[in-house]
Amino acid sequence: MELITILEKTVSPDRLELEAAQKFLERAAVENLPTFLVELSRVLANPGNSQVARVAAGLQIKNSLTSKDPDIKAQYQQRWLAIDANARREVKNYVLQTLGTETYRPSSASQCVAGIACAEIPVSQWPELIPQLVANVTNPNSTEHMKESTLEAIGYICQDIDPEQLQDKSNEILTAIIQGMRKEEPSNNVKLAATNALLNSLEFTKANFDKESERHFIMQVVCEATQCPDTRVRVAALQNLVKIMSLYYQYMETYMGPALFAITIEAMKSDIDEVALQGIEFWSNVCDEEMDLAIEASEAAEQGRPPEHTSKFYAKGALQYLVPILTQTLTKQDENDDDDDWNPCKAAGVCLMLLSTCCEDDIVPHVLPFIKEHIKNPDWRYRDAAVMAFGSILEGPEPNQLKPLVIQAMPTLIELMKDPSVVVRDTTAWTVGRICELLPEAAINDVYLAPLLQCLIEGLSAEPRVASNVCWAFSSLAEAAYEAADVADDQEEPATYCLSSSFELIVQKLLETTDRPDGHQNNLRSSAYESLMEIVKNSAKDCYPAVQKTTLVIMERLQQVLQMESHIQSTSDRIQFNDLQSLLCATLQNVLRKVQHQDALQISDVVMASLLRMFQSTAGSGGVQEDALMAVSTLVEVLGGEFLKYMEAFKPFLGIGLKNYAEYQVCLAAVGLVGDLCRALQSNILPFCDEVMQLLLENLGNENVHRSVKPQILSVFGDIALAIGGEFKKYLEVVLNTLQQASQAQVDKSDFDMVDYLNELRESCLEAYTGIVQGLKGDQENVHPDVMLVQPRVEFILSFIDHIAGDEDHTDGVVACAAGLIGDLCTAFGKDVLKLVEARPMIHELLTEGRRSKTNKAKTLATWATKELRKLKNQA
């Protein structure tokens, strides 16, 4: 009885009672988990207990078996499997007995069954479960509650378990699901549970979809369910069609004309949002699939082979029916629409964009009449829909087909930036931003640039949602203007460009925008800073005085922000404070890159002092530390060797960054900075190397360090060796052993992420070897004898390159690094290398591949390495 009372108190409004109950349950779970779970399952299984007690008991069981965190979940599953088999059997019997006895929804028992199943089925236990669940659904005497909760359990199992574990059970599971979905099934609750279960099982029913008769049957049942009067069932059935379209596109031709087309078009027209959303989602998915197929077709054509799968061009064929529904849906916007609410109006905009990318030129004639008819409509909803439709078709069609249309529309768009409706202004600003990004020639043409800039500058004072889009338009405009400017042959940046005359005003307005009191709304503050960064980055020489001014403003703001720290009251203040520091650091990086060397020297003391203060005050915030480290990197780039005077003061913070592997982005930034310091300070980095090397080696040996940090560390060894030359000898043995170990790493080749990682790791090993050989060899005509210390490893290094050559997954980057290293080995060790390379014909194939590469680096280095090998051959 005591347990029941305590379970009932887990929903008590009295905080003390609630906490006491939770403490008791936590203690019981720790003291004797098996007994606790058996007791809980008894409470759950007894229909005489209160609903509150049963639900709470189910929740306790479920939470002891599963977790959102995959690592904890795996631990819980192991812990369950370690429990005595009799106790487990008892719990399993009770939770199965509970199915069908609960009068409330959703069923607790179904979640418990699934939790246990996901632990036991992968280790081939509880073989009787699936047959028992199937029997529950197919037995004509089963109650509605029994069928519903059992189908829920099946759905949860399908959702959470690795599909391979259920492959051999897919027929039985499908039988139960289809039984529950049939139109003869009287209960909509059962139908819903079955339709949801089908949605979760689609990944592992491939064998059933491959057989025509079974596929017909599944498709028939799903299509019938889309006509169910119960909205919940209808939505779930449509969700199935959306997913089936992605998984089984190749099989859909039979069903498209007779059924799917009509069902989804009807759904798109529905007044019920959830139904309309699924109809639109279906066609968005068709576009996604057909774009992938178009890419596959062009790759196949390049390689002179037929594609594996071909597109049926459903989207193109349906344009004339889809576009009118989508443009009509665009007029259903909600005036106080919150950005986070997904609704048919937003989905229609996305679907139009996808159709535009997928069908290219073909979409324009279908959308243009709607735009022309409504862009000046007195009803704001239609004006907005017309602008939205216009903005949505800018990517996909041939730019030359769109350009005249856009230039023609420019005066209207400039006018709409002053529209009485904030929604229309917002959409117009977004559309102008897309024009600047995708068709910049239309935006920076002589006729409209001045009025466009005028309306954008005014737009920065509009509501946050409008101003935020204007900031983005400025970013794209600056980039386009910079790329269109004339650059003298010997110069890196243009002397002047089309934004020069308004540059100072734009920068001033953006700085004002970053200071707006409502800057936290719609991401306005960060959009304005990002826009400022783009504009400074893309500025011509005659804008330099304004860049100097901006630099001083940013530095002043950084100092002000650091003084605010003592006034922080709340967590939200702290978040805004950290965000502002990060934005200022990022902006600082951009202005520093533009600043001339002598100016940089004048401000560097103040900049460095601010950054050091920031490191001191934000030891707890990884995000700010990362941004501050990146800002130091930029300062190092700009100052070069002059940075040496700050090293003593900065060294402790570099150490803290290198040790902060818990926030691995910070650690990565610190490792990257070590490389920058080596390039800038050259041999002057020597006094700091012992400490840095020790931290780097500790990180490599620590398995809690995120794997993405390790390749970067290996590559930095090469930078250090290049910087300090012969002084690297004292680290040589340990570094070469580390590289030998890292270059033998193996990964699971079926996991694409791990294949990428392996390439990254190999590229870093090759870069490290290159730095070491070049550093020890010296840059004089005569090779320094220190390099002979690497001689014993040369054969291993070439075997490593040979191994890479034989791995078909190697990237261009790896080929380039390998070729560069071969060339360096030739110049350092001469004819010995030739013999070792001759014995490994795959290396020659790798160099041939490099010489034919589309990337410049691989081509240049492979050609050079081949020449070096040829030189040795001629000498021999």
UniProtKB/Swiss-Prot annotation:
N-acetylmethionine sites (modified residues): M1
Pfam families: HEAT_EZ, IBN_N
Family the entry assigns: Belongs to the importin beta family. Importin beta-1 subfamily.
Residue numbers bearing the N6-acetyllysine modification: K211, K835, K867
GO BP: any one term: protein import into nucleus
Region feature (IAB-binding): 329-342
Disulfide bridge map: none
Cross-referenced InterPro entries: ARM-like (IPR011989), ARM-type_fold (IPR016024), Armadillo (IPR000225), HEAT_type_2 (IPR021133), Importin-beta_N (IPR001494), Importin_beta (IPR040122)
HEAT repeats: 3-29, 32-62, 85-120, 129-160, 170-201, 212-247, 260-302, 314-359, 363-392, 399-438, 449-485, 500-537, 544-592, 597-639, 644-680, 686-724, 729-777, 785-828, 834-875
Region (Ran-GTP binding): 334-419
Source species of the chain: Mus musculus
Subunit structure: Forms a complex with an importin alpha subunit. Interacts with XPO1. Forms a heterodimer with IPO7. The KPNB1/IPO7 heterodimer interacts with H1 histone. Interacts with SNUPN. Interacts with H2A, H2B, H3 and H4 histones. Component of an import snRNP complex composed of KPNB1, SNUPN, SMN1 and ZNF259. Component of a nuclear export receptor complex composed of KPNB1, Ran, SNUPN and XPO1. Interacts with SRY. Interacts with PRKCI/atypical protein kinase C iota. Interacts with KPNA2. Interacts with KPNA7. Interacts with SNAI1 (via zinc fingers) and SNAI2 (via zinc fingers).
Lineage, uppermost ranks: Eukaryota, Metazoa, Chordata, Craniata, Vertebrata
PROSITE patterns in alphabetical order: HEAT_REPEAT (PS50077), IMPORTIN_B_NT (PS50166)
The name this protein goes by in its record: Importin subunit beta-1
Gene: Kpnb1
Residue stretches in coiled coil: none
